Curated annotation (Swiss-Prot):
Name recorded for this polypeptide: Chanoclavine-I dehydrogenase easD
Listed pathway(s): Alkaloid biosynthesis; ergot alkaloid biosynthesis
UniProt-listed SUPFAM superfamilies: NAD(P)-binding Rossmann-fold domains (SSF51735)
Catalytic activity as recorded in UniProt: chanoclavine-I + NAD(+) = chanoclavine-I aldehyde + NADH + H(+)
The protein's role, per its UniProt record: Chanoclavine-I dehydrogenase; part of the gene cluster that mediates the biosynthesis of fungal ergot alkaloid. DmaW catalyzes the first step of ergot alkaloid biosynthesis by condensing dimethylallyl diphosphate (DMAP) and tryptophan to form 4-dimethylallyl-L-tryptophan. The second step is catalyzed by the methyltransferase easF that methylates 4-dimethylallyl-L-tryptophan in the presence of S-adenosyl-L-methionine, resulting in the formation of 4-dimethylallyl-L-abrine.
Pfam (any one): adh_short
UniProtKB keywords: Alkaloid metabolism, NADP, Oxidoreductase, Signal
Gene3D superfamilies according to UniProt: NAD(P)-binding Rossmann-like Domain
Family per record: Belongs to the short-chain dehydrogenases/reductases (SDR) family.
EC number in record: 1.1.1.332
InterPro entries: NAD(P)-bd_dom_sf, SDR_fam
Enzyme class: oxidoreductase
Name of the gene this protein is made from: easD
GO biological process: ergot alkaloid biosynthetic process; protein homotetramerization
């Protein structure tokens, strides 16, 4: 079983879907604290109740978080360090999708500027802001409390499939994967690992928009493994879940 016992984790997009599944599994496996950041507060109370039922010893700290704001992300991570004193791992799962098969060809003509920017602000800028703040906190904490630390960024199998559609989504997720691999080489000397998970699409919303789907728990197991000590030799990987790489 992947070891995450007694550790502190930050999860963006953690109140629903893959993020909530990751939180539940981390609690089941003994995580000390889960710091959840999500733009939508609707599911936070339910998540807190779920975690309490799974493991009453796991603390849950929920924050309304806009990952497209670097200052918002920086304050969130600073608050985690101030409140809990450390950060052992992070999963950056917050993201937004585009509907596939909804536009007439050539679909590039309907890829408008506003939609492009919105998708990139969350799916790529948000990953940059979150990863940067987490690395800063982990580097500072590891100087006084050394140990293996891990960051997992969630991209998508769509980043590899070269679909003639959803250009902003696929391109932003490809950027996420490339960025994470580069960061992994940068931070490994400081005892920080960075990896990517690229799942097939998850949940009914995406199914209605033309994607095949897998369960959130399937993706969560891979994320938690990468956050755990069991994956210590692994860094710079991009692991596909639920579908073969094209």
């Amino acid at each position: 079983m992947a070891s995450v016992s007694s550790k502190i984790f930050a999860i963006t997009g953690g109140a629903s879907g893959i993020g909530a599944a990751t939180c539940r599994l981390l609690a089941k496996r003994g995580a000390a604290t889960l710091c959840v950041g999500d733009l939508c507060s609707e599911n936070m109370k339910q998540l807190e109740n779920d975690i309490k039922e799974i493991n009453p010893n796991t603390k849950v700290h929920c924050t309304v978080l806009d990952v497209s704001s670097s200052s918002n992300v920086d304050e969130w991570i600073k608050d985690i360090i101030t409140t809990f004193g450390d950060l052992h791992g992070a999963a950056n799962i917050a993201g937004i999708a585009q509907g596939a098969g909804l536009r007439q060809a050539p679909t590039i003509l309907e890829e408008d500027d506003q939609q492009w920017k919105k998708v990139f602000q969350v799916n790529l800028d948000g990953v940059l802001y979150s990863t940067r703040a987490q690395v800063r906190a982990m580097k500072e904490s590891s100087s006084t409390n050394p140990g293996d630390r891990s960051i997992v960024n969630v991209a998508s199998i769509a980043s590899m499939s070269h679909m003639p559609d959803v250009f902003a989504y696929g391109t932003s997720k490809a950027g996420c994967a490339y960025f994470t691999t580069c960061v992994s080489q940068d931070v490994m000397p400081f005892g920080i690992r960075a990896n990517t998970v690229s799942p097939e699409e998850v949940e009914e919303t995406y199914k209605k928009e033309g994607f095949s789907v897998i369960e959130a728990d399937d993706v969560a197991r891979t994320i938690v493994w990468l956050l755990s000590e069991d994956s210590r030799p692994v860094f710079g990987a991009n692991i596909n879940v639920g579908a073969c790489m094209p």
